[in-house]
């Protein structure tokens, strides 16, 4: 008899995009709107989880609530007390037992097929646990000047520059000593093995992703 066909590989998990929010309405709007705008350009299944970390800004809270009502796939959580970055993203990462997670600072902007590229890099090998992209201002992931803020060139916006860089070395990835929490993709199997961020040791934040990696 003919050999049985090989089973199809299991589909990769969907992704929870987790954005902790505390202040700065304009930056938060740009971040969330960029995620929503480019969702249609990415085939990776995703859910947006925005967590208001007890913001004192009533205008920000009002905008988030209105936006969550209008947008499908937008889950808004509100902390009763300020938990800081670590406690807040830990809450986000427990909203699913199976989805991968992507931590995104509220002062970032994304563009084009950003999520598909991060997802592809995460599943390039079984030994990959986290993925962090380059950015114009992200310490060891700053590009082209390492550990410096790189202003956008004149007449370039985020999407235009992203498309240029994506075409320069398409699909390329390198190993780095640690992920950086401004935009950090974490595979669920990695999260299950390591556990959540260490809120007891790192309190309100800074250094928790280095400890995790």
Language-model regions: role of each:
Residues 14-16, 47, 211:
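Cell-envelope/extracellular polymer assembly enzymes that use nucleotide-activated donors
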Residues 79-96:
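Glycine-rich, basic loop-to-helix element that forms the pyrophosphate-binding segment
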Residues 36-78:
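Acidic donor-binding segment of Leloir-type glycosyltransferases
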Residues 109-149, 201:
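Conserved donor NDP-sugar-binding/catalytic core segment of glycosyltransferases
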Residues 86, 137, 150-189, 204:
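A recurrent flexible, glycine/aromatic-enriched loop bordering the glycosyltransferase active site
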Residues 101:
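Short aromatic/hydrophobic "clamp" motif used to bind/position activated sugar donors
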Residues 113-119, 174-195, 200-213:
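A short, conserved alpha-helix in the catalytic core of glycosyltransferases
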Residues 15-27, 31, 38-39, 51, ...:
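A conserved hydrophobic helix/loop-capping motif in glycosyltransferases and polysaccharide synthases
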């Amino acid at each position: 008899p003919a050999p049985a066909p090989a089973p199809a590989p299991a589909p990769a998990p969907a992704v929870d995009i987790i954005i902790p929010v505390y202040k700065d309405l304009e930056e938060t709007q740009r971040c969330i709107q960029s995620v929503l705008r480019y969702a249609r350009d990415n085939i990776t299944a995703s859910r947006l989880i925005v967590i208001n970390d007890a913001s004192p800004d009533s205008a920000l809270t009002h905008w988030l609530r209105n936006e969550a009502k209008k947008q499908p796939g937008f889950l808004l959580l509100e902390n009763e007390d300020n938990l800081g970055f670590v406690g807040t993203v830990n809450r986000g990462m427990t909203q699913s037992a199976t989805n991968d997670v992507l931590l995104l600072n509220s002062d970032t902007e994304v563009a084009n097929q950003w999520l598909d590229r991060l997802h592809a890099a995460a599943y390039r090998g079984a030994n990959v646990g986290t993925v962090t992209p380059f950015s114009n201002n992200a310490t060891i992931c700053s590009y082209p000047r390492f550990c410096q803020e790189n202003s956008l060139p004149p007449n370039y916006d985020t999407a235009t520059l992203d498309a240029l860089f994506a075409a320069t070395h398409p699909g390329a990835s390198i190993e780095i000593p640690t992920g950086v929490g401004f935009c950090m993709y974490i595979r669920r199997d990695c999260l299950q093995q390591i556990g959540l961020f260490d809120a007891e040791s790192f309190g309100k934040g800074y250094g928790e992703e280095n400890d995790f990696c």
